Structure formats: C-alpha cells, structure tokens
UniProtKB/Swiss-Prot annotation:
One of its GO terms (molecular function) is nucleic acid binding. Belongs to the UPF0102 family. This is UPF0102 protein XOO3839. It comes from Xanthomonas oryzae pv. oryzae (strain KACC10331 / KXO85). Transmembrane segments: none annotated.
Amino acid sequence: MPAARQQRGAGVEAAARALLEQAGLRLVVGNANYRGGELDLVMRDGQSLVFVEVRYRRDDRFGGGAASVDWRKRRKLVLAAQLFLGAHPALAALPCRFDVVDASGEPPVLHWIRDAFRADDC
C-alpha cells in the first residue's frame, strides 16, 4: 500500500477513534490482526464490546465506505472478532456489536453507524 494511502488510513482511523471516544467509548485495542482479518478498533461502550470497522472513500458516488462492507468483509470481521474473544476470555462474556465508521470526502466527513450488522447476518 502506498505510504500516502497508509497515512490517510491512519488519520481517518485516529479521527474515528476520537469521534467514538467523545461519545463515551473507550479503546481496548486498535489494529488487531488475526488470520484472515483485521479489527480496526475494539472498544468498550459501557458493558458492551464494540468491533469497529473504519472505511474511507474519497467520494461516495458508489455508496461510500459503508457500502464496501459486504458479506465477505462482514464474515472476515466476525471471524477476527471470534479469534479476538478466544484470545481475551475475560471479555468473551460481554455482549458484542459491530459498528462501522464511514468516512468520505476531502477533508473526510465521518458517519458512525451503530450496530451496522450482526454476527448471525453473515
């Protein structure tokens, strides 16, 4: 991945994290890599564990970043979340949800989609 693209992605993830922290969520871990998938942000929202996918698109002509979280991507995220929970058994009993932060435009405008999909939808 080109350096400029990596830098843009890191900046958008940092902005997404700041948005969620302003809303009261707390970071558990960022950029957790597991076989077959990466979790951009894992956060706590009260007693819930939130797996956050951050997607950036320069423009939203084709549905923006959220539209790119198709069934294949959702399945990878669910698998990564299962592996995360297996590695962190103390968190495994918490209710979980999957959120998406969609970013588009220059400068990026963020939209937080709470409970964007469920594990059993995949």
